[in-house]
A protein has these predicted regions:
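Aromatic- and glycine-rich beta-strand/loop motifs that create alpha-glucan
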Residues: 1-17, 245-246
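Pore- or pathway-lining transmembrane helices of multi-pass membrane proteins that form conduits
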Residues: 11-20, 154-175
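Residue-level recognition of transmembrane alpha-helices
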Residues: 14-15, 47, 51, 70, ...
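Hydrophobic alpha-helical transmembrane segments of multi-pass membrane transport proteins
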Residues: 20-24, 43-115, 146, 165, ...
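Short helix-capping/hinge motifs at transmembrane helix termini and TM-loop junctions
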Residues: 25-34, 58, 112-121, 153-155, ...
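Membrane-interfacial helix-loop-helix junctions in multi-pass membrane proteins
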Residues: 35-39, 121, 171-231
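Alpha-helical transmembrane segments and their short interhelical loops
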Residues: 86-163, 213-237
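Short cytosolic juxtamembrane segments of multi-pass membrane proteins
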Residues: 240-248
Length: 248
């Protein structure tokens, strides 16, 4: 975590990019181009859930990319030669990534809240609690996925390519930028099998959608996110990291 806080360019860019996306796209589309049947009062408010998920995606990618710096500098080999097990080392690194992602996602949500029309159907504090729990589960899942990929993809460039190829299509078909109900059947199927859809839906229900407006429902959202977070995070910890280009 200290390395990320010292890298101001990484810290600021991973938070400012989603916020700028929210400001310019939200205000631009709100002027006459907003999709119908929004669960929020306006398109800017609707985008907040997707922007928080986008922040978590950026954070997981950037945090896990530090694996390559540690590997190439010999730090990872030194850590793995310590009395601690490989899983303990990976747990510490991934936990730091989870904490950073949760912090950044929460900051984006809190910065956006005063400027958009949130309904807080459960009340402000319970709504924030639901949103925070969603952000935590989302970042656990993303951190596990990023850790599993980083331990197998040889180069940082390849890692970023695989992460972008895997996550950005999921982000676009998650309801982050347009409602997923009343879409063609094949898009609705993609939304239902998309893990990010459940995070977006839970954040929408926490902040501005009423109880009947959620695509899946809060209970289903948390059940899916909890199972996926546990399974994917366990997979990330189970992958033995490669220390050399040959994989040894």
């Amino acid at each position: 975590m200290r390395a990320v806080t010292r890298s101001r360019s990484q810290l600021y860019s991973s938070m400012l990019t989603p916020l700028l996306f929210l400001v310019f796209l939200g205000n631009g589309v709100s002027e006459g181009l907003a999709p119908a049947n929004l669960t929020a009062g306006n398109f800017t408010a609707y985008l907040v859930a997707g922007v928080v998920v986008m922040t978590s995606v950026f954070s997981a990618t950037f945090s896990s990319a530090s694996y390559y710096k540690d590997r190439d500098s010999g730090i990872l080999r030194m850590l793995l030669s310590s009395p601690n097990s490989a899983r303990t080392v990976l747990f510490g690194k991934s936990l730091a990534g989870v904490c950073i992602g949760v912090l950044q996602g929460s900051v984006v949500l809190l910065l956006a809240a005063p400027f958009v029309e949130f309904e807080w159907q459960y009340g402000v504090l319970p709504g924030l609690g639901v949103a925070l729990a969603t952000i935590v589960l989302l970042n656990i899942m993303l951190s596990g996925l990023a850790q599993a990929l980083a331990s197998r993809v040889e180069t940082m460039q390849g890692f970023h390519l695989v992460m972008n190829l895997a996550l950005f299509p999921l982000l676009f078909f998650s309801g982050a930028f347009f409602p997923v109900d009343n879409l063609p059947m094949w898009l609705e199927v993609l939304a239902r099998i998309n893990p990010l859809s459940y995070a977006v839906d839970a954040l929408e229900l926490a902040a501005y959608a009423d109880g009947t407006a959620g695509f899946f429902g809060l209970a289903v959202d948390f059940a899916v996110l909890t199972v996926l977070a546990a399974a994917v995070y366990a997979l990330g910890l189970a992958r033995t990291p490669r220390l050399t280009w040959s994989g040894k």
